[in-house]
Amino acid sequence: MDFTTLQNDFTNDYQKALIANNEFLEAKKYYNGNQLPQDVLNIILERGQTPIIENMFKVIVNKILGYKIESISEIRLSPKQEEDRALSDLLNSLLQVFIQQENYDKSMIERDKNLLIGGLGVIQLWVSQDKDKNVEIEIKAIKPESFVIDYFSTDKNALDARRFHKMLEVSEQEALLLFGDSVIVNYSNVNHERIASVIESWYKEYNEETQSYEWNRYLWNRNTGIYKSEKKPFKNGACPFIVSKLYTDELNNYYGLFRDIKPMQDFINYAENRMGNMMGSFKAMFEEDAVVDVAEFVETMSLDNAIAKVRPNALKDHKIQFMNNQADLSALSQKAEQKRQLLRLLAGLNDESLGMAVNRQSGVAIAQRKESGLMGLQTFLKATDDMDRLIFRLAVSFICEYFTKEQVFKIVDKKLGDRYFKINSNDDNKIRPLKFDLILKSQLKTESRDEKWYNWNELLKILAPIRPDLVPSLVPLMLNDMDSPITNDVLEAIQNANALQQQNAEANAPYNQQIQALQIQKLQAEIMELQAKAHKYAEQGALSQTTNESEKINQAVAITEMQQQNANNANNEESNNKPKKKLKTSDKTTWRKYPSAQNLDY
């Protein structure tokens, strides 16, 4: 890459981005309250009036950023191969280390603010090493006004860009560390300090050896030339910048909320300052012969407490008339309120989502209007989610390429507390490249504390009769969900109660064992008693059955003998005088004819 090409490309890209950059700078001025033009401000100050600025733009931006900061985000890496599951768990832990670094939240909030106000958010990831060669991935939000994108790029995330330019201002010491003593750097004096203006350009160029595209870095100055060039600064040949555009117009210029809100904001400021002037002013018309001295009359009537002398019959003949501005004030106030409502609609919010509703409605109606009022934020949330996926994908790529040394990391887990883990100490925790999918879920926290309390109460009412053992463990979750300041105290109280219960259980363990042994012996005795009774009843049943069978046999024998005896009596009449033979039963009693009279003596 030669110096002339760098100059021409930067000039073309910068001129194309100049409109969007100027709009972004103006949006920052409006956000910080500098909304009145200088000529209007001078007129207001000459009148002795206090400038009035109703910064609805800042209210809306801060409200949306508040919703975004409080949103719930979950990032998870899912491997495409089953054998990479253990490695993916390790990479998920390293992503948590990346998220929990001190500069992460600050950079992401700055990114969200720039994206929302001006329509462009830029994040830079960089790989750094300490003196022990421990690797760390740094994150930083880049100012959009100092960042230039390839003017041919049309993608929302600039994935089709061929080059990026970042304008830097570095001190003399930083320049020496960056370029060394052998490079002549062009400095300028700013506030008695030598500052070097440097342009950092990244180009996507084709490598003939690897037959693939890679990003190369060039550090140069528009007047001096190229200070330093680096071929493929990163091992994976990636570019460290992640870009997101909120909206783009027909000329491919990015923009944010400011473009739609600015006309309404200007009218509101104009109306407020105009009404402030009209409330303290009046219009007077008088005939020349109605006053003694015109100059004195005008000067006197301009005072708050004025006593002026007029000619006789001047008031009676209505030669002096005062006109107020009440009608104009009402019309101007009504138009200003209409512009406020239109401004909220353009921002995608309503009074409920802004926390400005004063109408009396049910809780369900307010919740529904609040949810519908946040639907306008989906474009912004979708842009940030897509950008977050690209950030985490690049971070994982850097981790797989540079985390080759044995290191120990610490992450803070809400459930497990501080947790330490080691990488590259053995084959099981060795970091290596893999194919993966990123799953990112984000959800806005729209429920108020009262709504959460109501939902948790309903859930506890359902679970208490079914699973009462789960209720104590759900109480800390409920308090944590409602951001209660006593969550830690409740957790400590539950842990103390569980510890005391455990101590009592250990102290009563011998007595409980004795009681359990006695209960086992009692159960064994009861079982033996039941078995004995069952055996007794079984023997009695068998005996009764045997007796019944014997009775049947004896009855049959007796009947046979009687039939034989009757036959003998017919042949031998003398047998009538002989005593009859008694029938015997099994229990040696006289047999009776009646079935129910067996074994009975009468």
From Swiss-Prot:
BP-aspect Gene Ontology terms: symbiont genome ejection through host cell envelope, short tail mechanism
The keyword Ribonucleoprotein is annotated on this UniProt entry: no
Membrane-crossing segments per the record: none
Coiled coil location: 324-352, 486-542
Compartment list: Virion
Disordered: region residues: 567-602
One GO CC annotation: viral capsid
Domain of life: Viruses
Keyword line: Capsid protein, Coiled coil, Viral capsid assembly, Viral genome ejection through host cell envelope, Viral genome packaging, Viral penetration into host cytoplasm, Viral release from host cell, Viral short tail ejection system, Virion, Virus entry into host cell
DNA-binding as UniProt keyword: no
Subunit comment: Homododecamer.
Function: Forms the portal vertex of the capsid. This portal plays critical roles in head assembly, genome packaging, neck/tail attachment, and genome ejection. The portal protein multimerizes as a single ring-shaped homododecamer arranged around a central channel.
The name this protein goes by in its record: Portal protein
